[in-house]
C-alpha cells in the first residue's frame, strides 16, 4: 500500500482510503468511482427497505469490491446486516478492502479473491442480497447469480454498457443480452427493459422469477433492484411479461406485443410505414410504488451526501410506477409535425382534462408517460401550438 499516494473520502457514515488516480478506469490499481455515490446511496435505502420487509438479518455479497466502499457501507450503515462478503479478483483491491474494514472498526466482513462467477457458485444459497456492479456488462455473471440466488432474495444489477442496451451499437446488445435494441427517443427505458428481460429469462432456467422493485437510468449506467422468487409456476407467469416493442419512426406510433414467441406487426396502423421491433424485453412493471415509497421514508433515517438528488429521482420513479411502457418526447412529436413546441405543463394539463393519465419520467425531462393514444396527444399539441 505504501507505493501509492493515498486519497481519503467519506460517503454517508463511512470513510475509505484508496490509491489516488488521474482518471476513472478499470486499469486503476483499486477501482473507486465518485460518480457512483448516488448509486450507492440509493442502494443503502433499497437494501434497508428490503431488510425491514424480510424482518431478519441479511447476508450481502458485494461481487466486485474494488476499494470496498459498497460492501463496507452496507455493513456500516444498514441495520440488520449479518455478514458481508466482499469479492475482487485483484490482490491489491483485497488489501485496501481489508484496510477499509479496519478503518471503520467493522466485524463480520469477509474478503475474498476469486473469479466472480466461481465465487457465487462456491457460496450457493448463502446470500440474501447479491450486488453485481461490474465495469461494463453484467451479462457474464447473471447465470451464476440466477443459479445461486436464494428464495426471496434481492438481486441488484448495474450495467454501464449503455451504448449497447440503447441501440447505438446493435450487435453487442444481441451478443450480450440476446435482444435487438432500437435507438429511439425512449432508448434508455428500452435498455432497462432489455436488461430486466434478460435477467428474467436467465433466472427462469432455474425456476426462479423476478419482481422489479426499482430501476433507473442515470448518467452512464442503468441499475435494477429485483426481488427473486422461486417456483416453476411463478416463473411461467413471470415470462408472460416478456415480449417486444414495435415502433414507427415516421409517426412515432408504438405498441407492446407480449409473449416470447408472439407474432409482431410489420405495418404501422397509423401511417402504413414499416414497424421496427425491439426485444425480447420486459413489459411488466419496472417500478414498485410501495417499495419506493418505503425507500423515501427510510431516507429520513440515513446520512446521504446526495440525498436531494436521491429523493428527486425516487419520487420521479414512484410517480411513473403505474404508467404504460415507453413515453412520448414532446419536442420529437413537434419536429415530425413541423410545429413549435408548447409548454410541457400545458400538454399535461390538457391530457388530464381529457380524462387521461399523464406523468413525467426520469428517463427524459421532455417525456410524457400517458395512456392517451398518439392521435389524441398530437391533436392536443397541435391545438396548443397554434394558440401560442
Swiss-Prot record:
GO terms (molecular function) for this protein are: tRNA (guanine(26)-N2)-dimethyltransferase activity; tRNA binding
Q: Which family does it belong to?
A: Belongs to the class I-like SAM-binding methyltransferase superfamily. Trm1 family.
Q: Which residues are involved in binding Zn(2+)?
A: 248, 251, 268, 271
Q: What is its EC number?
A: 2.1.1.216
Q: What does this protein do?
A: Dimethylates a single guanine residue at position 26 of a number of tRNAs using S-adenosyl-L-methionine as donor of the methyl groups.
Query: Which InterPro entries does the record match to this protein?
Result: SAM-dependent_MTases_sf (IPR029063), Trm1 (IPR002905), TRM1_arc_bac (IPR022923), tRNA_met_Trm1_C (IPR042296)
Q: Name one Pfam family in it.
A: TRM
Biological process, per Gene Ontology = tRNA N2-guanine methylation
Please tell me which top-level EC class this enzyme sits in.
Answer: transferase
Domain Trm1 methyltransferase: residue ranges: 7-381
Query: What broad taxonomic lineage does this protein's source fall under?
Result: Archaea, Methanobacteriati, Methanobacteriota, Methanomada group, Methanobacteria
Name the record gives this protein: tRNA (guanine(26)-N(2))-dimethyltransferase
Provide the binding site for S-adenosyl-L-methionine.
Answer: 40, 70, 88, 115-116
Task: State the organism of origin.
Answer: Methanobrevibacter smithii (strain ATCC 35061 / DSM 861 / OCM 144 / PS)
Q: Tell me the Gene3D superfamilies matching this sequence.
A: N2,N2-dimethylguanosine tRNA methyltransferase, C-terminal domain, Vaccinia Virus protein VP39
Q: Gene of origin?
A: trm1
Does the UniProt entry include the keyword NAD?
A: no
Amino acid at each position: 500500500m505504501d507505493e501509492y499516494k493515498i486519497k481519503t473520502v467519506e460517503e454517508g457514515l463511512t470513510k475509505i482510503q484508496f490509491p489516488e488516480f488521474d482518471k476513472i478506469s478499470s486499469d486503476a490499481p483499486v477501482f473507486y468511482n465518485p460518480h457512483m455515490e448516488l448509486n450507492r446511496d440509493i442502494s443503502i435505502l433499497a437494501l434497508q427497505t428490503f431488510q425491514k420487509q424480510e424482518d431478519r438479518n441479511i447476508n450481502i455479497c458485494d461481487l466486485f469490491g474494488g476499494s470496498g466502499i459498497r460492501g463496507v457501507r452496507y455493513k456500516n450503515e444498514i441495520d440488520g446486516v449479518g455478514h458481508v462478503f466482499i469479492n475482487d479478483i485483484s490482490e491489491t483491491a483485497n488489501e485496501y478492502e481489508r484496510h477499509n474494514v479496519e478503518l471503520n472498526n467493522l466485524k463480520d466482513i469477509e474478503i475474498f479473491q476469486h473469479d466472480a462467477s466461481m465465487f457465487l457458485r462456491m457460496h450457493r444459497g448463502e446470500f440474501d442480497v447479491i450486488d453485481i456492479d461490474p465495469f461494463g456488462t453484467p451479462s457474464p455473471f447473471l447465470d451464476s447469480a440466477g443459479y445461486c440466488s436464494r428464495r426471496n432474495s434481492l438481486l441488484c444489477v448495474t450495467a454501464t454498457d449503455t451504448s449497447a442496451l440503447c441501440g447505438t451499437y446493435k450487435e453487442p446488445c444481441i451478443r450480450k443480452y440476446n435482444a435487438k435494441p432500437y435507438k429511439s427517443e425512449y432508448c434508455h427505458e428500452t435498455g432497462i427493459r432489455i436488461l430486466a428481460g434478460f435477467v428474467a429469462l436467465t433466472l427462469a432456467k432455474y425456476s426462479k422469477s423476478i419482481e422489479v422493485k426499482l430501476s433507473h437510468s442515470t448518467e452512464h449506467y442503468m441499475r435494477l433492484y429485483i426481488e427473486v422468487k422461486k417456483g416453476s409456476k411463478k416463473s411461467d407467469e413471470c415470462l408472460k411479461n416478456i415480449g417486444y416493442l414495435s415502433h414507427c419512426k415516421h409517426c412515432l406510433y408504438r405498441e407492446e406485443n407480449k409473449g416470447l414467441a408472439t407474432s409482431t406487426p410489420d405495418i404501422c396502423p397509423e401511417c402504413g410505414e414499416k414497424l421496427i421491433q425491439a426485444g425480447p424485453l420486459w413489459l411488466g412493471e419496472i417500478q414498485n410504488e410501495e417499495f419506493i415509497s418505503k425507500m423515501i421514508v427510510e431516507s429520513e433515517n440515513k446520512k446521504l451526501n446526495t440525498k436531494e438528488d436521491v429523493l428527486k429521482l425516487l419520487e420521479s420513479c414512484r410517480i411513473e410506477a403505474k404508467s404504460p411502457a415507453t413515453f412520448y418526447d414532446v419536442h420529437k412529436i413537434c419536429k415530425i409535425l413541423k410545429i413549435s413546441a408548447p409548454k410541457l405543463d400545458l400538454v399535461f394539463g390538457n391530457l388530464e382534462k381529457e380524462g387521461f393519465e399523464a406523468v413525467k419520467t426520469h428517463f427524459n425531462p421532455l417525456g410524457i408517460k400517458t395512456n392517451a393514444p398518439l392521435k389524441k396527444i398530437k391533436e392536443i399539441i397541435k391545438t396548443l401550438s397554434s394558440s401560442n
